[in-house]
Every structure is written in structure tokens, then in C-alpha cells.
Amino acid sequence: KGDCYVKITVDGAGKEGPVVLDLFGKAIADRIPGPARMPELVRRLPEAGRKAHTEKYIAQNFLGYQYLRGAYLAEYELKGQNLQGFILDCGDTKSAQAVVSRFAFAGNAPAGALAAGGKAFRDRYNGDIQLGWQGRFVWGCTGGDATQRQVLAAAIAKSLKGGKLIQ
């Protein structure tokens, strides 16, 4: 709500768990000013194939890298394959280019040629990653096969364009 993103989860709460979480969440939301909606970049993650309630915000160390900060992500199932799509707002074009360059030269070998969604990398820790970037944004996905990663990365780019965040 407003500029805040709060996600509450619990394990082993029994039947009452969802009811208590809902009441607790509403009590928090009532104290936060602004409209009740997801942050802009969560709304830019495509809905097609997105698994319900998997949206997250990772403030730092996204994918285990200190320089990957402020990632909005969600889990997807496309053609029976599990993927994770993400968007980072790097603040400006220069910072986004620096993030991509640093990732590319961090020992991540190319996993394929330039594609519609950007560039594919083979990350030694996270497997194959499809990255796209334009302006201040970096986006991409992990998991699934190369085709589904390209499809999801292209869908994220299209959604960013639809929100007029990139051209």
C-alpha cells in the first residue's frame, strides 16, 4: 500500500493461519497511507503463468551478488516448466549498464547468442539466466529451458513498454 510492500507468511499455523494473517495484514494496511495496490514493478511482472502469491522483493544480494539490489520477482509455470522472472530498477541507464557489465564479467559464460529478450548467460551459481536491459531497468529470468526463458524475458520487456517505463 502506498510506497510500502509488506508480505507476511507463516508455517504450521493450522486452519486459523490464513484468517489470522488476513486480519494482521489488514491491520497493518490500515495504518499505511496511500492507495492499496502492488508496487509498479510487481504490476509489470506478466500475469500469464505467474503462480499466485509468489511475488517478492529482494533488497540486496539478489541471486547471491552484492551489486544486484532491489529485485522484484515472481515464480512462473510455463508449459510445465518452473521459472522465476525479475525486474531491477537500477536508478539510471549508467547504473543498469554497470550491473549488466559486472554480471557479464563476473565469470558468467555466455549460454547463447543475443536474443529478443536480451542476452543469455550461464551463471556458475544459478544456472542459465536470460537478461534484458534498457534505460534504468534490468530484467530477466531463471529456470526452465532457453525457449521459455526467452518467452518470459520478452513478456517482461513488453510489460515494461506497456507501462511506458522503457521504449
Question: What is the role of each PLM region?
Answer:
Residues 1-167:
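Soluble, non-membrane globular domain cores that form compact, hydrophobic packing
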